[in-house]
Structures are given as C-alpha cells and as structure tokens.
Amino acid sequence: MTKTIFITGASRGFGRIWAEAFLQRGDNVVAAVRQPETLKELAKEFPVNLFVLQLDVTDKKASFEAIEAAKARFGGIDVLINNAGYGQIGAVEELSEQDVRSQFETNVLGSLWTIQAALPLMRAQKSGHIIQLSSALGLNTVTLMGLYSATKFAIEGMTETLAAEVSDFGIKVSLVEPGRYDTDFSGSHSLARSESISVYDNMRKVFWDYADQEDSGKPAATVNALFALVDSQEPPLRLILGKTAYPWVKNTYEQRLKTWEAWQDVSVAAHG
C-alpha cells in the first residue's frame, strides 16, 4: 500500500537518502527543505510522487502551512519524519547564548512545530506514525557535543511523552537513534562551531582525531531499517542504528545501573 511520507531536512544526509528510497519503492514523499532547488533533479525524476516544499522548521506558521499543503496534495500524511537539525561543537564554557538558542530552536522547537501541525490531521485519520530523528548522543554524551546532546536529550523526553499521549488515537511514535554515520554532518551546513577557548584545544584535537578514525556507518544501509520501521504494525519506541552505537549505549546503561545500585542506600534514606 502506498504511503505518504513527510520528511523535513530532505535535501541531504539521511533525509535525502530516505526520500529517494521511499520514492523508488512507490511511496509519495513530501520533502520539506530550506532550499527547494537542491531537489530539482529528483523532482524531474518523480514529478507525481514527490512534492517539494520550502520550509524553515523554526517558523511555526510555515510548518502548519506545510502540513496543510501536503494534505491538499496527497489527501493525508501517513508518516512524519522529523529529520531536520544540525550539530554544534564547543565546550560548555564556550557556548554563546545565540549558539544555545539557535540549536534548540532548530532541533527541538522545529520538531515540535511539525508534530503539533500534523497531530490534528493524524487524529482525524485515526492513524499515523511520527518518527523523530534523535541520536546515540541523546542517550549518552561526548566532550564538545554537550549542546547537541542537550537538544537530543530534550527530544528523547518530549517524544517518549508524546508516544504515551497519542497512543489512544491510533498514532505511533518512534525515536531513531543513529551512531556515527558517513554523512555530511561534520560539514559546514550541519555542524556549527562555537568561539574557542585555548584551554580546550587539546580536547578538540583528540575529538577530531577520534572522529577521523571511528568506524562510520554507511547511510544507505539504513534504508531497510526505515522501511521495516514504517511498515511495522507495532514499531518500537526506540530504534538504534549502527553497530557501534548499540554496545556504547548498552555499556552506558549498565554503568548507570551500577552507580544507582551502589548509591541506593543514600537514595532511599533521602526519602525521609
């Protein structure tokens, strides 16, 4: 059965790969992007099934208008994939107020606006699936990525709550949590850099040396995972992507449990 998939940030990276994959299997795709000209050739290849919309996800009014335009074009939306976002590299001490506001406005509020816009339509349909791109960094952190992790931790909490709130309406909700992938995430469009303080220069060098050596996943390899998620009658709330992310996250939770257990007496005594 043909599905209508609304994808934000569909001009590059995961968003572009997933948009092309859904089109190739015959689905309808609404590609919401900041620069529609980036999808000009793809629009020529799929003139019927692809609907390209200009959208800055930080614009709440525009997000609601985009959902309405998608409904007018295809009659409804089966799946909303909130993929738009970017990273910010910088130690916590280095972050400016503008760094923080911009990151949260795009990564958190940008997702919130499209979710709020899509929910009335999905409730009326009594069906729908909201897929929120998070990250393994929404479950753990690394140095210099504290702000990005903060937005993803926020996304994790908001999306898990959303899943509980809308399940009675027939709406499914999933978080997709990729590890490191060979996308353009570290490029100028997807990774901003804060003003640097010299005491963190060595930490920066270690960060980039490790990033260059890490076994990055291939973005195209995620396509079947997205198909399985979208087509599942009972999709998981969380789906980790990549062989490096799973053991890292598993170890994180094991260490947290050990710490909580070691301090359990103190925790219980604090109840009063």
Task: Label each PLM-derived region with a short phrase.
Residues 115, 151:
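Active-site helix of classical SDR
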Residues 55-65, 97:
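The beta1-alpha1 cofactor-binding region of Rossmann-like NAD(H)/NADP(H)-dependent oxidoreductases
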Residues 91-92, 99-101:
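Substrate-binding pocket helix/loop in short-chain dehydrogenase/reductase
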